[in-house]
Curated annotation (Swiss-Prot):
GO terms for cellular component: ribonucleoprotein complex; ribosome. One of two assembly initiator proteins, it binds directly to the 5'-end of the 23S rRNA, where it nucleates assembly of the 50S subunit. It comes from Corynebacterium urealyticum (strain ATCC 43042 / DSM 7109). Disulfide bonds: none annotated. Belongs to the universal ribosomal protein uL24 family. GO terms for molecular function: rRNA binding; structural constituent of ribosome. This is Large ribosomal subunit protein uL24. Part of the 50S ribosomal subunit. The keyword rRNA-binding applies. One of its GO terms (biological process) is translation.
Length: 103
């Protein structure tokens, strides 16, 4: 999976199309990413279950994972781009397909 934690991405399809956010977490085995402020859901939490963002029980709004095919990485110019790879000194470097710069 070419998208990593910390990347800034834009949603290219779905109800949140056009939204930008930072990748909070990546799930490579499921091909999904968790993007800050995108695909927010309401989750009902019991009093005893400590969840992310919940002090006690009730209804919690949090981000849900979104498939990687629905997002694109934003390059240094601020445009959405695909990602390629280049090998330099035996290291794999991610490169923007749009302008050829390192990501």
């Amino acid at each position: 999976m070419k998208i990593r934690k910390g990347d800034t991405v834009i949603v290219i399809s779905g109800p949140d199309k056009g939204a930008k956010g930072k990748v909070i977490e990546a799930y490579p085995k499921r091909d999904k990413v968790l993007v800050e402020g995108v695909n927010r859901i309401k989750k009902h939490v019991a009093n005893s279950a400590p969840e992310r963002g919940a002090e006690s029980g009730g209804i919690v709004t949090q981000e849900a994972p979104i498939h990687v095919s629905n997002v694109m990485v934003i390059d240094s110019d601020g445009n959405p781009t695909r990602i390629g790879y280049r090998f330099e000194d035996g290291k794999k470097i991610r490169v923007s397909k749009r302008n050829g710069k390192d990501i």
